[in-house]
Amino acid sequence: MVHYISPAPLTFEVIDKILSKNYKLALSEDSKKLINDCKAYLDHKIESSAKPLYGITTGFGSLCKISISKEDLSQLQANLVMSHACSLGEPIHQDIIRLMLLLKAHALSLGKSGVQLVTVERIIDMFNHNVLPVVRELGSLGASGDLAPLANLFLPLINEGEVWYKGKICDAKAINAKLGWAPIELGAKEGLALLNGTQFMSSHAVYALLKAFKIAKYADIIGALSLEAYDGRIDPFLPQIQAARPHPGQIETARNIRTLLEGSEFQQKEKTHVQDPYSFRCMPQVHGASKDSIMYVASVVEREINSVTDNPTIFMEDDLIISGGNFHGQPLALVMDFLSIALAELGSISERRTYRLISGDRGNIPEFLVANPGLNSGFMIPQYAAAAIVSKNKQLCTPCSVDSIPSSNEQEDHVSMGGNAATKTVKVAENVERILAIELMNAAQAIDLQR
């Protein structure tokens, strides 16, 4: 199956299909025309204009006052990619690398970047042949785009760097030769278009959100099972309560749990307690608030992945090349901090339900979910593990977007730290999956003990 990159917006549903069903990528004819027309326009402007064009006929960052001769324009771009390729730390997940390639190809195809068609086609070839550049998680300030990681992503275009190929890290030059791919001679502005952009942040954001959509669903299912095991009351999930405070996520969560427990033999039993602890009773309010937050974050990220975030930006229809600030990652930095908090709360309330299930405070299930507590420790220590992970998430949820360290001789005097916000949000999401898995195991054991 093939996804044709076109001016049509990317959606999470489309991206999920591309990743999960191993779609190939191709450029639509509309996108090819936009790329070619923009490149021709840029070449004409360089030839006909004596006016300096940032990053095209000048140096970069605080070196923007230095003019570059026309003979050196291609070398300028190659030098940029090589000098900026300094991402550090652990290699990022290969699905996130695939997302980076997809999102960059989509952004460049919108016809405002001035790149060669052959460059975009090579990015697509890398995606389709699963030749994935090695990109590491540290090094982006999240302003001027994601310079260091994107430089590592595109080193293989010029026969440099390393790639994942058939499960191994290989020299990019060797894999290019094996596949018959000649190195790309970067044109004017092209290195800048590749490196200036928010695709490191946005690919992590998309990856985290695809997990978040599932986590929000699983939290309701696992929470409903825990409510059953704990002999909890259904009353707090009745529609009248939700109508009195009609937040969409709250209404959805309560409806989900009512549906899951409809006809349950446990719910038909007489209850001796008047109410349940908050971790059960307030699932609609807590899960629902996280759901609403996730949907807000998704709206921002979907807008971002369909935007042009390199600089300068070319507007052929207005005969303008504008040096602006669309590369600044503040929109993503803020919502990634928000998403990490929303997800962490799903983990926090889950761990509290796990604690209640092993506490023996209801009398319907034994302490630590084991027939002979004392002789056996039962499910004591999985709760320790969940608590440790919850604590770790609290550390990770310290906002990154409140920080800024100036760079490039103060030319770039405010940065978003969105790269750090995005990478830690993926870690929070993965941690919440672990916490929910522990709750599921405890809830299933508690149910079995009552059969």
Task: Please report, for each region that a protein language model flagged, where it lies by residue.
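Accessory "access/gating" subregions that flank catalytic or transport cores
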Residues: 226-348
